[in-house]
Curated annotation (Swiss-Prot):
Gene: cobT
Similarity field: Belongs to the CobT family.
Listed GO biological process terms: cobalamin biosynthetic process
Protein name per Swiss-Prot or TrEMBL: Nicotinate-nucleotide--dimethylbenzimidazole phosphoribosyltransferase
InterPro entries registered for this protein in UniProt: Nict_dMeBzImd_PRibTrfase, Nict_dMeBzImd_PRibTrfase_bact, Nict_dMeBzImd_PRibTrfase_N, Nict_dMeBzImd_PRibTrfase_sf
Reaction equation(s) it catalyzes: 5,6-dimethylbenzimidazole + nicotinate beta-D-ribonucleotide = alpha-ribazole 5'-phosphate + nicotinate + H(+)
Function of the molecule: Catalyzes the synthesis of alpha-ribazole-5'-phosphate from nicotinate mononucleotide (NAMN) and 5,6-dimethylbenzimidazole (DMB).
EC code(s) of this entry: 2.4.2.21
Pfam families: DBI_PRT
Family annotation (SUPFAM superfamilies): Nicotinate mononucleotide:5,6-dimethylbenzimidazole phosphoribosyltransferase (CobT) (SSF52733)
Organism taxonomic ancestry: Bacteria, Pseudomonadati, Pseudomonadota, Betaproteobacteria, Burkholderiales
Pathway in which this enzyme or protein is active: Nucleoside biosynthesis; alpha-ribazole biosynthesis; alpha-ribazole from 5,6-dimethylbenzimidazole: step 1/2
GO-annotated molecular function: nicotinate-nucleotide-dimethylbenzimidazole phosphoribosyltransferase activity
């Protein structure tokens, strides 16, 4: 049995006024009008602060995709059957999924974690087995996870990240029904109306969305006492989200740059931030998805997304698409010339 108190590491405040000033000065002195690179400059500043460097280098970036099934999916909250979870895990590993293609394109090492899929997988490179159970319990009938299962999943996420190289972690997930868990976590931890947090997920029609919202209202009411972050996580699930919570906490403790994908990955950061309030300092929001709850969640975290492409896929696909922007931000700091070095006159010269 894993004690939840032992699974939550201390996360320090990385604010460094002196380093921030040096980074800003370096950016201001590049051969360009002041602020002309817009949000690429604020991104460079954030990465520099996370890595504690005036010349940050992103090394061995890791794409971590956590997968699990949800008991709540039996209530018809998704347009797809639960079998799609294991089928997509196979697709990830075969190189046929969007995140597989994009990770390969951008040089991101892909690791897929079975956190609780209702299927046995053959061992192979790129697959890590950390299965808690064959899917969570139905949250409409009781807690999705026990407290012990929740703590073990968080511990698993920390363990997986400890074994990965590099200083950047990109978050991905797969689990039919997990947009429901994300909506429930957002409503409870941010104090928002569940209907506004709930979208069509994998493509529900209007009737399906109305049914999903009704189910989630009932689930939220059933677990009215689950107000603390770990209690809410155990009540709503899922195993992949809890494993990502652990991954985020470990990456934050190690001062890795954490690249958040869509709604579900962001829900894991929401829980981690509720547990340790300096987590979001290490995070970059890759994009704002078409799920209505995602923009609300990012606003709650105080994060501004880099892209808005109407994505609603998950997997880590948005993080992979945003990755070149992070690399460009670092190169601006490291390689772009200053006015003095280039012999270029300033505006006020």
């Amino acid at each position: 049995m894993t004690d939840s108190n032992q699974t939550i590491p201390s996360i320090s405040d990385i604010h460094d006024g002196a380093l921030a000033a040096r980074l800003q000065s370096a950016l201001d002195n590049k051969t360009k009008p002041l602020g002309a690179l817009g949000r690429l400059e604020s991104l460079a500043l954030r990465i520099g602060l996370v890595l504690g460097s005036e010349t940050p280098v992103l090394e061995a970036p890791q794409m971590l995709v956590c997968a699990a099934d949800h008991g709540l999916a039996a209530r018809g909250v998704s347009a797809f059957p639960s079998d799609v979870t294991w089928q997509m895990v196979e697709n990830f590993l075969a190189g046929g999924a969007a995140v597989s293609v994009l990770a390969l394109q951008h040089g991101l090492a892909l690791t897929v974690v079975d956190c609780g899929v209702r299927r046995d997988f053959q061992a192979r490179p790129g697959l890590v087995s950390r299965r808690i159970a064959a899917g969570t319990a139905d949250a409409s009938a009781g807690p999705a996870m026990t407290a012990e299962q929740c703590a073990q999943a968080i511990a698993n996420g920390r363990e997986v990240v400890r074994a990965l190289p590099g200083n950047a972690l990109l978050l991905g997930e797969m689990g039919i029904g997990n947009s429901s868990a994300a909506a429930l976590l957002l409503a409870r931890l941010a104090g928002l109306d569940i209907d506004g947090c709930t979208g069509s997920g994998t493509g529900l029609d209007a009737a399906g969305l109305a049914r999903k919202r009704e189910v989630l209202r009932d689930v939220l009411a059933l677990h009215a006492a689950a107000s603390e972050p770990l209690d809410a996580l155990a009540a709503f699930g899922g195993f992949e989200i809890a494993t990502l919570v652990g991954a985020v906490l470990q990456a934050a403790q190690e001062r890795r740059v954490i690249v958040i994908d869509g709604f579900i990955a962001s829900a894991a950061v929401l829980v981690a931030q509720a547990l340790q309030p300096h987590v979001a300092q290490r995070c970059v929001a890759a994009h704002s998805s078409a799920e209505p709850g995602h923009a609300l969640l990012l606003k709650h975290l105080g994060l501004e997304p880099l892209l808005n492409l109407d994505l609603r896929l998950g997997e880590g696909s948005g993080g992979a698409l945003a990755w070149p922007l992070l690399e460009s931000a670092c190169r601006i700091l490291r390689e772009m010339a200053s006015f003095e070095a280039a012999g270029v006159s300033r505006k006020d010269s």
